[in-house]
Amino acid sequence: AAVVALWGKIGKSADVIGNDALSRMIVVYPETKTYFSHWPDLAPGSPHIKAHGKKVMGGIALAVTKIDDLKAGLFDLSEQHAYKLRVDPSNFKILNHCILVVISIMFPKEFTPEAHVSLDKFLSGVALALAERYK
């Protein structure tokens, strides 16, 4: 309930959150650039970063609607990341951390300790669900 309530407050800013989180991940964790080497511009806020950040947050929005069964709800995304994109699942945790940082900066009033723990637990569940097809 806490995640759904928080998402209701921050969801309209999902595109900005996604752009900022992905930009932050690529700068702070440069080893993650390898997955985006086919993009001509990896600068923070570049068109590809913005578009993929929007896509990532679309996946998070989907996960919010599937919160009661993340494994089933994110099955297709797990398949895509495991078999097509071949993303190392440890990167999900890195991006989750960047998402938390951005939300804490953008929404300090809403990002209470209780919201923090709820969102962290939810994003960890999303990461586990996305890693499901790697087994």
Curated annotation (Swiss-Prot):
<dbReference type="GO" id="GO:0031720">
    <property type="term" value="F:haptoglobin binding"/>
</dbReference>
<comment type="subunit">
    <text>Hb1 is a heterotetramer of two alpha chains and two beta-1 chains. Hb2 is a heterotetramer of two alpha chains and two beta-2 chains.</text>
</comment>
<protein>
    <recommendedName>
        <fullName>Hemoglobin subunit alpha</fullName>
    </recommendedName>
</protein>
<keyword id="KW-0479">Metal-binding</keyword>
<dbReference type="InterPro" id="IPR002338">
    <property type="entry name" value="Hemoglobin_a-typ"/>
</dbReference>
<keyword id="KW-0408">Iron</keyword>
<keyword id="KW-0813">Transport</keyword>
<feature type="domain" description="Globin">
    <location>
        <begin position="1"/>
        <end position="135"/>
    </location>
</feature>
<dbReference type="InterPro" id="IPR012292">
    <property type="entry name" value="Globin/Proto"/>
</dbReference>
<dbReference type="GO" id="GO:0020037">
    <property type="term" value="F:heme binding"/>
</dbReference>
<dbReference type="GO" id="GO:0005833">
    <property type="term" value="C:hemoglobin complex"/>
</dbReference>
<dbReference type="GO" id="GO:0019825">
    <property type="term" value="F:oxygen binding"/>
</dbReference>
<keyword id="KW-0349">Heme</keyword>
<comment type="function">
    <text>Involved in oxygen transport from gills to the various peripheral tissues.</text>
</comment>
<dbReference type="GO" id="GO:0046872">
    <property type="term" value="F:metal ion binding"/>
</dbReference>
<dbReference type="InterPro" id="IPR009050">
    <property type="entry name" value="Globin-like_sf"/>
</dbReference>
<feature type="binding site" description="proximal binding residue">
    <location>
        <position position="81"/>
    </location>
    <ligand>
        <name>heme b</name>
    </ligand>
</feature>
<dbReference type="Pfam" id="PF00042">
    <property type="entry name" value="Globin"/>
</dbReference>
<dbReference type="GO" id="GO:0042744">
    <property type="term" value="P:hydrogen peroxide catabolic process"/>
</dbReference>
<keyword id="KW-0561">Oxygen transport</keyword>
<dbReference type="InterPro" id="IPR050056">
    <property type="entry name" value="Hemoglobin_oxygen_transport"/>
</dbReference>
<dbReference type="GO" id="GO:0004601">
    <property type="term" value="F:peroxidase activity"/>
</dbReference>
<feature type="binding site">
    <location>
        <position position="52"/>
    </location>
    <ligand>
        <name>O2</name>
    </ligand>
</feature>
<comment type="similarity">
    <text>Belongs to the globin family.</text>
</comment>
<dbReference type="InterPro" id="IPR000971">
    <property type="entry name" value="Globin"/>
</dbReference>
<dbReference type="GO" id="GO:0043177">
    <property type="term" value="F:organic acid binding"/>
</dbReference>
<dbReference type="GO" id="GO:0031838">
    <property type="term" value="C:haptoglobin-hemoglobin complex"/>
</dbReference>
<dbReference type="GO" id="GO:0072562">
    <property type="term" value="C:blood microparticle"/>
</dbReference>
<dbReference type="GO" id="GO:0005344">
    <property type="term" value="F:oxygen carrier activity"/>
</dbReference>
